[in-house]
């Protein structure tokens, strides 16, 4: 009888362990994925990644809020934790800039801006084995599933010249800027007036 009970307990524990293993999230799921044709696969679940910052881009020629867009920046959790420990971005870092339309509501005292429909995402990837310049940039509309790397002049040059840490705009990420300064990886020179126009 004891043997049967022990066997039943062992089977129960084995089944539980197997189910936990299956349901556990893949710790490497935030790494970049590519097709066989070297296109980047659209990152899924990025809204559960680490949120870094938002910006509202306003068109000076627009009126009544037209042409304004929000940008929300997310970074892969594994890269974020490595940055907090070292002040630098590890290989296979992934950033997502989510672009959304803006809706404005005015009152006598304030003008409020709200995020609305998804326009698309821009993805920044550090992959030293795949890209000669280490970082590459990809553009997705609201439904695109894969994308080729953008031309060098489209994104890389601005990021390389204006990024405070490697090719990234850490100067605009208030939770990371002090860490980069502490580790000595922060390029203070990028904080000139030109950097604010990026």
Predicted ranges, named:
Residues 8-9, 22, 42:
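Generic detector of low-complexity/intrinsically disordered segments
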Residues 18-26:
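Signal peptide processing junction and immediate N-terminal pro/mature segment
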